[in-house]
Amino acid sequence: GTLAAAARVGFRPRLTRVTVLGDRQKSYKGKVLLVNPWIYDFAAHNLWIEPLGLLTIASVLRDNGYTVTVLDCLASHPGAPVARTDGSGRFFKTVLDKPATVAFVPRRFGRYGLPLDWFDAALAAAPRPDVILVASGMTYWYPGVIEVIKRVRARHGRVPVGLGGVYATLCTEHAQQHSGADQVIAGSGMAEALRLADDVTGNNSEPDRYADPRSWPAPAHHLVSRPFAGTVASWGCPYQCTYCASHRLQPAFVRREAGVVVDEIAGCLQRGIRDFAFYDDALLAGSGRHLAAILQGILSRALRARFHTPNGMHARGISGNLARLMRRAGVATVRLSLETLDPVRQQTTGGKVTT
């Protein structure tokens, strides 16, 4: 098929490598390989998925003089399903045997993303790193993490491997026992990722500067191949809903400056990106005033873009004025969150919606 034909003509996934230059060339500190793993599941749709945390770590490392390579298992490639005009779509799926624990599910289980041989070819083409950092998404996607670490171990031996992300934070003990990583980083990981790179290479980049999310640089969107970009207006969530792990992943609720978000979007627009997804857990917290400031900035600079809200928004935060502003600024996909129909539970979980 198309994949085989692409392989015959020597296609290999494109890797992007960047050494940071500022006002003057920064001292070379070392090479870091960042890996975004596969998804292992019964179904997976690309609703504007971008490894935002990993790309923020990439920016932190680059800003401190490291050479960064990103190997993205979810990157588009010849033979993969064609994306829709808004950037969303489907991933290439390799059907696998179902794990015993879910063997009863009447669906086809699979690995979503690059074929294994393409991953191995991309890994072989990348510069030999001093340290490897692997991201993780949903906890039950951990087989993708294990497969990535197994393959980077086979290629790079005892090069130190760090693992961060959602699975690493929520299932730390499981990750320590089963992932194969040398270090499991729980929490946001920006400072700890830089600290690990420094420890391995013998540098001191003062990683504690990145303990506060307000100090984080914009994600290095250009290091992955996507027809869209993810962004956040804020990190964390002010609510403490019992069914949600947001406060464990990011304990503090911190808003980014509206102008910084607009600058990030403008930079992506200059690279031809037109579709943007807000990843916020609480985009409309505070009656949507922060989102309104961002959208006003978009309009004042005449930026033409389309915005999507795959995480869902709290219905209570939408007013008539905000809805009209969202439409004028280009918000194209509006998803509203509904956790329960029980009025008592609606109030105890923050009153985000009423029915």
Tell me the role of every PLM-derived stretch.
Residues V20-Y28, L123, I318-G330:
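Short amphipathic alpha-helices and their capping/turn segments at secondary-structure boundaries
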Residues T2-G10:
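Extreme N-terminal basic, low-complexity initiation segments
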Residues A6, V20-D23, A302:
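Intrinsically disordered and other compositionally biased segments
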